[in-house]
């Protein structure tokens, strides 16, 4: 089960990758501001995605496949995926 939106970031100062979580991706960027980061300074965004209840990070594409497999999205989303219309998951698709 996907439990939160997530962003994988590379922090320049520590040369480490971190994953920040929140209910929606834009809240995560607000967290960065709260931590003193200016937009796109001191870090690079590696990837937007989601975290599962087991702590696994999934990118938007893998997140969509996973959410369909576990029944976490509605029939409209599944149909759009099957038709090739939808290829990425957004938090609005989940909650």
What are these regions (language model features)?
Residues 1-48, 52-95:
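Linear-motif-rich, low-complexity cytosolic tails and juxtamembrane regions
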């Amino acid at each position: 089960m996907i439990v939160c939106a997530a962003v994988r970031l590379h922090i320049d100062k520590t040369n480490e990758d971190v994953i920040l979580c929140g209910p929606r991706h834009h809240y995560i960027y607000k967290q960065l501001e709260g931590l003193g980061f200016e937009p796109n300074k001191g870090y690079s965004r590696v990837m937007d995605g989601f975290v599962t209840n087991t702590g696994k990070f999934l990118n938007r594409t893998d997140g969509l496949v996973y959410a369909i497999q576990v029944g976490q999205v509605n029939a409209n989303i599944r149909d759009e995926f099957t038709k090739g219309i939808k290829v990425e998951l957004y938090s609005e698709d989940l909650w």
